Amino acid sequence: MATSAEWHEDYTKMSEEALNFSRAVKSVQEELEAVDWYNQRAQATTDQQLRRILEHNRDEEIEHAIMGLEYLRRTNKAFDEHMRTYLFTEGDITEIEEHATTTPGPAAPSRPKSRG
């Protein structure tokens, strides 16, 4: 059962879509917080085996966060539009924004960044 501390608005007046959106956002926030905690612990420890475990756990949390972001992209037009504009691009991010906001029509096609 939800508590009033979890919602800024009366959740009984919210659609299922809005509730699920909020759930996804909260989940992504929690996963990113866990990523940060595991990363801090991995950086702080001098035990190499523990560091590898913590880095593994951190990377699992990153996977979970990305899954949540993908859900938001699939279910929210604005997330989809902005993710398609900015993710997997190269160059200065603010220039990508400038191009996207000053050029009529769709944003410039994004290219996957090489990891090589």
PLM region descriptions:
Residues 1-116:
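Iron-associated oxidoreductase/ferritin-like identity signal
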